[in-house]
């Protein structure tokens, strides 16, 4: 796999990159470059870009001068942060508490990306959502279900890390099975161990589908980018179908915790 940059709109570019596990399996990763209404840019998540990709980003952003913020949305995605901060040291650096704890040598902004205070700073261009009913930062560092989801209003694009995955078979194989949107397989292990957690998760998903019902693109970290415009089913409908597929998991959790 080679890094590539997908132009979603005149304001949104999704950078598709490599992430290898044990040097063997490339599960991919991503970041997004977004132009704000004020003409400045932000990076959603951090990724160490190959030279040709960085040249494209720099050409769009006046050699990076117009990148005003690097916004880290997944608490367990930390590998590329120091490099991208070194590339654009003037950009304000935002993250979760885990980012700050793991990289205390960097100059972090005080507003955590999973906070209302942070969301208010960028509310003209984005909406953000944090899953309810699941651990945001799991004690088990192998469980990466939760992240802050971002919705760019102008391009109608959802940027999401591990929470959602979009699967599409390659080439002619895609005719054998329709693409589908699914929740990350670690959901059952990250639901909060308390009464009502499963129902809180259901309501969060339903709220998300309603609030972002106009979404036409979904960029997911370890899978693919989903483009839907004036097509059926909508992304909102696919989100609700994904919820239906995990209903047995939620019922099992309710039977155990209430």
Residue ranges of predicted features:
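A general structural motif
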Residues: 38-40, 64-67, 90, 154-156, ...
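Active-site HxH/HxHxD metal-binding segment of metal-dependent hydrolases
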Residues: 58-126, 237-245
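Pre-active-site segment of Zn-dependent metallo-hydrolases
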Residues: 23-27, 31-69
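N-terminal/domain-start segments enriched in small and hydrophobic, helix-friendly residues
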Residues: 53-73, 77-79, 170-187
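Metallo-beta-lactamase
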Residues: 4-13, 43, 48-49, 98-249, ...
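Short, flexible loop segments at the rims of nucleotide/cofactor-binding pockets, characterized by
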Residues: 19-23, 43-49, 69-73, 134-140, ...
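Zn-dependent metallo-beta-lactamase
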Residues: 1-38
């Amino acid at each position: 796999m080679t890094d590539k940059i997908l132009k979603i709109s005149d304001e949104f570019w999704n950078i598709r990159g490599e992430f290898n596990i044990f040097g063997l399996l490339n599960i991919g990763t991503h970041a997004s470059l977004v132009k704000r209404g004020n003409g400045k840019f932000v990076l959603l998540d951090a990724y160490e870009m190959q030279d040709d990709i960085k040249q494209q980003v720099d050409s769009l952003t006046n050699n990076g001068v117009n990148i005003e913020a690097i916004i880290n949305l997944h608490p367990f995605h930390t590998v590329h942060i120091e490099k991208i901060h070194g590339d654009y040291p003037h950009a304000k650096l935002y993250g979760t508490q885990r980012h700050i704890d793991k990289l205390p040598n960097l100059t972090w902004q005080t507003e955590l990306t999973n906070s209302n205070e942070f969301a208010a700073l960028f509310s003209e261009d984005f909406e953000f959502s944090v899953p309810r009913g699941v651990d945001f930062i799991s004690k088990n560092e192998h469980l990466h279900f939760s992240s802050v989801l971002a919705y760019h209003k102008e391009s109608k694009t959802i940027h999401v890390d591990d929470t959602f995955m979009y699967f599409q078979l390659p080439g002619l194989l895609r005719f054998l099975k329709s693409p589908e949107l699914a929740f990350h397989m670690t959901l059952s292990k990250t639901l909060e161990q308390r009464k009502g957690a499963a129902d809180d998760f259901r309501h969060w998903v339903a709220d998300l589908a309603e609030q972002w019902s106009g979404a036409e693109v979904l960029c997911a970290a370890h899978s693919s980018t989903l483009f839907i415009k004036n097509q059926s089913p909508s992304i909102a409908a696919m989100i609700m179908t994904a919820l239906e597929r995990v209903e047995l998991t939620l019922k099992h959790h309710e039977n155990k915790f209430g």
